[in-house]
Amino acid sequence: MNKDKQFIKSFFIRMLILLAAVIAVVVIFDPFYHYHKPLPGLKAVLTDKEYQCIGTLRTFDYDSLIVGSSVCENYNNHWFDEGFDCTTIKAIRSYGATADLSYLLDAAYESHDLEYAFYNIDPSSLSASTEPTFESTGCPMYLYDNNIFNDYAYLLNKDVLLEKLPYMLANSFIGDYDEGDSYNWAQWKYFGRDMALGMYARLPSVRDMQPETVNSVELVGNIALLEAQVEEHPETTFKFFFSPYSMLWWDNAYRSGELDAVIYNEKQAIGALLEYDNVEIYYYQDDKDVITNLDNYMDMIHFSKDINYYIYDKLAKGEERLTKENYEARLDGMYILARKIVQEEIPKYYGK
């Protein structure tokens, strides 16, 4: 009997020691950067934005952010560091919804003062829900909340211990992993006309054009979220920009009956944001040479890293900036270009 008790006691002691060792290893190396920035000698290996982004915003050293959806993942942070004399990391959410990006900005501002926010506005973000979607889309909320009692899901996670941690260590010591390429997905992707056309599920018929105010409720809410960030942080220069989606996206906007609303939403958002002294807005959607060259794209939205650099370079030079005097004309020009694309460019691939 005593031997049985001794065995059970010994077993539990060993289990506790093992669990403590596992927890210690995860806390010390912390591949999701939940507790601290990388240890000296280790690189910030960032490949899982849903798991790592929130931690980096709380624990890394930086003074500027690249904020946006998946089209921002292929920027190299070092470009912005050199071009704007700052230290940059990314605040990325695949969907790019305003509420989600505002959540990430709030997390950053809890412990950091930001000099710049390089913020990509996706058209869809202006008509998206004004409630954060992290929980509803299955993100690991134990990494997002401040409840240490549910951290066991991270600390005692087999995948973290046997996959994520070794991957981080391997990339720190082997190969030429570039920390500036955080969350970059372009390396193994193919960009070209055939790929872009193949990924485009074109609507078989043209729907009736929706009223331009169809998303008014969501639009007002999303503009308010953007204005709140700008108003609450006058020390930050917000450099908002609109990225060049391909002509296939504009064709889809027309065929789905959303084109009028897209332009209206952008006009309303831009007009509101231009009222603030700490806001600059840059517009790259209407670059015809880029958006009509499908070799730049892998689908109707996502462009190659060359286009990311092209946008960065224009931002750094202050090119294509919108003002109160010119923004309506630029957006009207985009509307005309979109209709021209439908009438002249798209028929080259799909016929009349």
What are these regions (language model features)?
Residues 267-352:
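C-terminal regions of proteins
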Residues 29-90, 96-107:
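Membrane/wall-proximal cationic-aromatic binding patches
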Residues 120-121, 130, 134-232, 328-352:
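Secreted/periplasmic serine-hydrolase-like ester/acetyl group-modifying domain
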Residues 74-75, 125-130, 246-251, 290-293:
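Short catalytic/ligand-binding loop motif for oxyanion handling, primarily in non-cytosolic enzymes
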Residues 71-151:
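Membrane-embedded segments
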Residues 61-63, 86, 113-116, 233-238, ...:
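Loop/turn elements at helix/coil->beta-strand transitions in domains of secreted/extracellular proteins
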Residues 194-276:
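Conserved, well-ordered alpha-helix/loop/beta-strand core segments that scaffold catalytic motifs
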Residues 12-31:
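Hydrophobic membrane-insertion alpha-helices, especially the h-region
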